[in-house]
Amino acid sequence: MAELACFCYPCDREGASVARYSRSAIKCMLSAKIDKSHSSQPYDTQVYGLAPPPVYKKRFNDGNNSRGMNFDTDMYDKVADLLVQILNGIKIGKDKAAEIMAVPISVRHLENLIYRIENKDDILSADPNLITKSVLIAMGLIKDCELTTTAEGGDIVFQNQGFTMWRLDYKSHVLMPITDPNFVEYKITLNHTNPIDDKIVKELVAELRWQYNKFAVITHGKGHYRVVRYSTVANHADRVYSTFKSIQKRNPSYKFNELDTRVIWTNWAAFVKSMLNGMKLDDSKRLLFTKMKPNESSFKGVTTERKLDEVSLLG
């Protein structure tokens, strides 16, 4: 994740409310000694124009911070250009742009959208309106859920009338690659917003139960499912809890999308319920380690029950 301010800044130019930073400006900012009292504002490099606020230094890989973005790349330029294009295209205005600069966005999600846009076989590449909608969803600026047509993409490994399951290949990414050679993760998006027939849901549950029984099906509350290794669920819980509390502070009316509990891993559904009821993180996470009965509404002949020794892999 990185704040929008790591890519662009509000401006008041003819036809533009936001402008992007250059790589040269970022390099200058990373090497400059800057008073802390000025760290929350874009830094004037005197030579290359404005650079991101120094408070976000750790978001960039300067050679000593491998967890930061690899900003000195063509991919950084593409993502920054895309964000500026979309925000200026909707005529966001300088004041509104200033309000959203601190909004965190998924760098990997945006890089995947670039790959979709560059793929001439993908419908996204030829539809400017769909591109705009996909980016605004990725930024959290509209309430629409990430559906299959607006998804970040990946390799499709399963699809039926209601759902599409994507294998996420973050290991080959440029900006923030995942270096764990054992990383495997999937995302399931809805194909439409209409009610989905039980038969279609059962097809998905059966696929997950028998083909992905070493994985937990969870949700981050954004209208899609995540299929992750049991050993990573605790880390996902930390991130989801932190993100939920952060969003709730900015927007008390925010609604966490719990999705279909027949698909979600029972323990994760319990974790989410406890989080939404105001329980502390540690208390909520204990439910991830507790043996639970499968959802009573699960489909006949298909179970999402997990063995206790599988749950104990949580770390």
Swiss-Prot record:
Residues 204-240 are annotated as: RNA-binding. It holds the Pfam family Rota_NS35_C. Its cofactor is Mg(2+). ATP binds at residues 106-108, 187, 220-222, 226. The active site is at residue 224. Keywords: ATP-binding, Host cytoplasm, Hydrolase, Magnesium, Metal-binding, Nucleotide-binding, RNA-binding. InterPro entries: Rota_NS35_C, Rota_NS35_N, Rotavirus_NSP2, Rotavirus_NSP2_C, Rotavirus_NSP2_N. GO terms for cellular component: host cell cytoplasm. It is found in: Host cytoplasm. Its EC number is 3.6.4.-. Homooctamer. Interacts with VP1; this interaction is weak. Interacts with NSP5; this interaction leads to up-regulation of NSP5 phosphorylation and formation of viral factories. Interacts with host DCP1A, DCP1B, DDX6, EDC4 and EIF2S1/eIF2-alpha; these interactions are probably part of the sequestration of some host SGs and PBs proteins in viral factories. Belongs to the rotavirus NSP2 family. This is Non-structural protein 2. It comes from Rotavirus A (strain RVA/Turkey/Ireland/Ty-1/1978/G7P[17]) (RV-A).
